Amino acid sequence: MDRNAKVLVVDDDENIRNTMKAILEDEGYIVDLAATGREAVEKTQKAAYNIALLDIRLPDMEGIELLKLMKDATPRTRKIMVTGYPSMQSAITALNKNADAYLVKPVNIEKLLITVKEQLQLQEEERQFSEQKVAEFIETRVKELSTPF
């Protein structure tokens, strides 16, 4: 399920980006990096990602703003907010703005990997549910069209 899953890591700290990339690539994920919100938006316009790890504070925009832009542009991408400024209010705001998960820096490697796997599983379940609903709709329409008046 998560073999070849694509992950976008968005963080202005190069060390954090590269560390997350190394950890995720060791697990078999395909990882792309962005240092700014604008760069992240550009990348999501060119490629589809399963997961986006979004820093809550970026040099050109707040992570919450990026979260909204990505939600509108890539609704199927699972968005995980990552922050070095943990507070209950920022967590609530992120989750209310449709973040799928929330991690606090310094990110525990095990917690990162578990969260990514959980989000990929949820993404797969949503995909299967959508396919099932489409199949049910088609089946119903075929029956309706096949039934004489």
Give the predicted meaning of each segment.
Residues A5, T36, E62-E65, T83:
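Acidic catalytic/metal-coordinating carboxylates
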Residues R17, P59, T83:
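The feature encodes the CheY-like receiver
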Residues G28-A35, K43:
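Short hydrophobic/Thr-rich beta-strand motif most characteristic of the beta2 strand and flanking loop
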Residues E42, I64-R76:
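Short amphipathic alpha-helix used as the core "switch/output" element in two-component signaling
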Residues V107-V116:
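C-terminal output helix
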Residues L122-F149:
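CheY-like receiver
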